A protein has these predicted regions:
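A composition-driven surface/loop motif
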Residues: 1-189
């Protein structure tokens, strides 16, 4: 979309040679089941809000990318900077996770924001990259976690942690969400 996408329900299975779901400005997912089986980047928009739903992403580059949309698979992958040092730092870019369950398997950064990331609820599991040129988490400003369930795995070459103002990690392990996680959802083949 050249502007905004709002997903409030439904079941989607997507495969793309570029972005699975792309909005230039705003992407809001409130509910539904989204299975992106193949893509360059899974979700991309300047401002991404995940409030609910079950999302599974398999991406050759970034799984979720809060960016101004300048990256593209045309001409090959873009070259990223070090952790928090992406080439397009923009404090207006954001990823907010308030609910839902999200599973990301990414060849590039698992989740990437050229601005900030905030997680207040839901479940996020990132099966990140194995090469040292990317990381499970990549953000330029901060990543604050005040609730939810967070697991990130990937290479340590560009590893970033959540910001110091976040709640202690042990609090995330108290309980799993009642809804099935995306990798537990069976899709038609």
């Amino acid at each position: 979309s050249n502007n905004a996408i709002y997903i409030e329900g439904g079941d989607m299975t997507l495969s793309s040679s570029d972005d699975g779901i792309h909005a230039d400005n705003t992407l809001v997912i409130s509910d539904g089941t989204i299975d992106i089986t193949k893509c360059y980047e899974g979700l991309e928009a300047a401002a991404i809000s995940i409030n609910g739903g079950a999302i599974s992403i398999t991406a050759s580059d970034d799984g979720i990318n809060a960016a101004d949309g300048s990256s593209s698979s045309e001409g090959g992958p873009r070259m990223g900077g070090g952790p928090g040092m992406g080439e397009n730092s923009d404090s207006n870019c954001s990823l907010t996770i308030n609910g839902g369950t999200v599973y990301v398997n990414a060849g590039g950064d698992g989740i990437d924001s050229n601005g900030y990331i905030v997680m207040t609820g839901g479940a996020l599991v990132v099966d990140g990259p194995t090469d040292n040129g990317n990381g499970g988490l990549d953000y330029n400003n901060y990543f604050t976690v005040t609730g939810g369930y967070l697991v990130v795995a990937g290479s340590s070459g560009m590893a970033q942690n959540i910001s110091d103002s976040s709640v202690p990690l042990w609090q995330y392990q108290e309980a799993l969400p009642a809804r099935p996680l995306p990798w537990q959802i069976q899709t038609a083949m």
